């Protein structure tokens, strides 16, 4: 049993107040303990076991179909990625490679634009402050802008020394005249860019103008049966 102390004011005979302490017993109330009983159902256990059996008993054909679909999708993605890589490489090699047709064409057009004789033959309207810009395009001559932007005609061949030669032909046009430029370039041993071997301009009614004259190779004559008879010449 526990006691609780309470202070209570009291009045004495003389009229003064004083406090008295009282001890009151405390009775503890009973505490109820609740027991929780968890029930177990055999129905849930049987249902879980049935779901596991259904998962294990998946037919073979859906598995094969899912595997085939996944494999085909993977092959398709890998093939598309590889094809895109090849296309990007070809475009990059064509546009940025020193031996690409685009680079050779741009170099040839710059040579024609900077050649005074070619500009005079094309009757360019040049002044002291400005120069006329030439037009350069492919083989087909039409008024259609999309047709003019077709690729330049070019061919490549390998010579006896194993070096690659580049042959190109394109048109240049001013406001008054039009001409055809023939270009031949050869793989260089020193530079990354091919070296121009020959370049000339043909304008109707004008004499052929060589921007770069080809070097004539001297062929030594051979004697009887391929042997040069007689004394050796220095």
Swiss-Prot record:
Q: List the disulfide bonds.
A: none
Q: What positions belong to coiled-coil segments?
A: none
Q: Which GO terms describe its biological process?
A: protein import into mitochondrial matrix
**Principal cellular location given in the protein's record:** mitochondrion
Protein keywords: Membrane, Mitochondrion, Mitochondrion inner membrane, Protein transport, Transit peptide, Translocation, Transmembrane, Transmembrane helix, Transport
This chain is encoded by the gene named TIM21
**Transmembrane spans:** 72-92
Q: Which organism is it from?
A: Kluyveromyces lactis (strain ATCC 8585 / CBS 2359 / DSM 70799 / NBRC 1267 / NRRL Y-1140 / WM37) (Yeast)
| Subcellular locations according to the entry | Mitochondrion inner membrane
GO cellular component terms listed in the entry, alphabetical order: TIM23 mitochondrial import inner membrane translocase complex
Full protein name: Mitochondrial import inner membrane translocase subunit TIM21
Instruction: List the Mitochondrial intermembrane topological domains.
Output: 93-234
InterPro entries the UniProt entry points to: Tim21 (IPR013261), Tim21_IMS_sf (IPR038552)
Family the entry assigns: Belongs to the TIM21 family.
Please tell me whether the keyword Mitochondrion is annotated for this protein. Answer: yes
Report quaternary structure and partners.
Answer: Component of the TIM23 complex, at least composed of TIM23, TIM17, TIM50 and TIM21.
Summarizing the function annotation, the protein's role is: Essential component of the TIM23 complex, a complex that mediates the translocation of transit peptide-containing proteins across the mitochondrial inner membrane. Required to keep the TOM and the TIM23 complexes in close contact. At some point, it is released from the TOM23 complex to allow protein translocation into the mitochondrial matrix.
Membrane topology, as annotated, equals: Single-pass membrane protein
């Amino acid at each position: 049993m526990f006691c609780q102390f309470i202070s209570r004011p009291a009045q004495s005979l003389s009229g003064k107040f004083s406090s008295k302490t009282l001890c009151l017993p405390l009775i503890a109330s009973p505490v109820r303990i609740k027991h929780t009983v968890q029930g177990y159902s055999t129905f849930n256990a049987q249902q879980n076991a049935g779901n596991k059996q259904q998962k294990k008993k998946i037919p073979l054909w859906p598995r094969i179909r899912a595997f085939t679909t996944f494999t085909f999708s993977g092959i398709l993605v890998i093939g598309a990625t590889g094809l895109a890589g090849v296309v990007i490489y070809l475009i990059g090699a064509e546009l940025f490679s020193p031996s690409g047709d685009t680079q050779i064409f741009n170099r040839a057009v710059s040579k024609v634009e900077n050649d005074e004789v070619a500009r005079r033959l094309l009757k360019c309207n040049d002044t002291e402050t400005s120069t006329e810009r030439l037009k350069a395009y492919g083989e087909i001559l039409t008024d259609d802008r999309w047709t003019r932007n077709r690729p330049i005609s070019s061919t490549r061949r390998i010579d006896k020394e194993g070096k690659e030669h580049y042959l190109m032909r394109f048109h240049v046009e001013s406001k008054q005249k039009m001409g055809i430029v023939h270009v031949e370039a050869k793989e260089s041993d020193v530079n990354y860019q091919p070296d121009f071997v020959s370049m000339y301009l043909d304008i109707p009614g004008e004499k052929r103008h060589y921007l770069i004259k080809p070097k004539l190779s001297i062929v030594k004559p051979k004697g009887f049966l391929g042997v040069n008879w007689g004394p050796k010449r220095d």
